[in-house]
């Protein structure tokens, strides 16, 4: 999938059909209800479940009050512009509770942990781990064999469209609770210490820390051993 630029994302959101899907559990004399074709029904006898757009389902419920004994509605979004990514055939490990929007690219053997939020246009390279509760903003790009630590935020850029997204090159380790501001590029093999706020580019093969993040040293063997990427965690 080719990465979308900001104008393409804006157009995608603007022109998308906004959706308010609902799931309704019904009980009553349901055989008397004429369900339209755009409502999916799973009904046996006097009970069942239906799926559809609220704009269609709401008047259906109102018009058939006499035939419905009881119902419960489940709804988790309103006028949503971007569907969630269809993950069924992605060659990666994606744990429950990750929220991944459509138009996201996920490489082979990547790992997405619980609670991660990945916005439209993001790219995750082969073998990269996105840890728990990480936020990847719109168009954020992470290279291959990286680790983005729990609770970290890579700032997204959709508006203004002229701004540049965060880019993390290959073999980078980002510690927990790091914030990387928009437009920052983290060079290949760099290490960002936990809790850092990265406001400017990070040179390849360096170690940075602090608020704002500053270079501490070049990557040495000791630091490399402490930040080793374990391929065993990425096997499917």
Swiss-Prot record:
Its EC number is 2.3.1.89. GO terms for biological process: diaminopimelate biosynthetic process; lysine biosynthetic process via diaminopimelate. It is an enzyme of class 2 (transferase). Pathway: Amino-acid biosynthesis; L-lysine biosynthesis via DAP pathway; LL-2,6-diaminopimelate from (S)-tetrahydrodipicolinate (acetylase route): step 1/3. Pfam families: DapH_N, Hexapep, Hexapep_2. SUPFAM superfamilies: Trimeric LpxA-like enzymes. It catalyses: (S)-2,3,4,5-tetrahydrodipicolinate + acetyl-CoA + H2O = L-2-acetamido-6-oxoheptanedioate + CoA. Keywords: Acyltransferase, Amino-acid biosynthesis, Diaminopimelate biosynthesis, Lysine biosynthesis, Repeat, Transferase. NCBIfam families: DapD_Ac. Catalyzes the transfer of an acetyl group from acetyl-CoA to tetrahydrodipicolinate. Belongs to the transferase hexapeptide repeat family. DapH subfamily. This is 2,3,4,5-tetrahydropyridine-2,6-dicarboxylate N-acetyltransferase. The gene is dapH.
């Amino acid at each position: 999938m080719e990465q979308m630029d900001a104008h393409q994302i804006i157009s995608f959101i603007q022109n998308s059909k906004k959706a308010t899907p609902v799931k309704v559990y019904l009980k009553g004399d349901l055989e008397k209800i004429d369900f339209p074709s755009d409502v999916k029904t799973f009904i046996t006898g006097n009970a069942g479940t239906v799926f559809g757009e609220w704009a269609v389902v709401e008047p259906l419920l109102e018009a058939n009050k006499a035939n419905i004994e009881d119902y419960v509605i489940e709804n988790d979004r309103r006028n949503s512009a971007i569907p969630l990514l269809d993950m069924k055939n992605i060659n990666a490990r994606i744990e429950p509770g990750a929220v991944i929007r459509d138009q996201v690219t996920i490489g082979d053997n990547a790992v997405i942990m619980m609670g991660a939020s990945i916005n439209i246009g993001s790219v995750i390279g082969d073998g990269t781990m996105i840890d728990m509760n990480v936020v990847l903003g719109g168009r954020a790009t992470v290279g291959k064999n990286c680790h983005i630590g729990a609770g970290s935020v890579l700032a997204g850029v959709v508006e203004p469209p002229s701004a540049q997204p965060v880019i993390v090159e290959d073999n980078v380790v980002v510690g927990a609770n790091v914030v990387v501001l928009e437009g920052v590029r983290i060079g290949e093999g760099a290490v960002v210490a936990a809790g850092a706020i990265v406001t400017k580019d990070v040179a390849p093969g360096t170690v940075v820390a602090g608020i704002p993040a500053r270079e501490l040293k070049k990557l040495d063997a000791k630091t490399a051993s402490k930040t080793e990427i374990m391929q065993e965690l990425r096997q499917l």
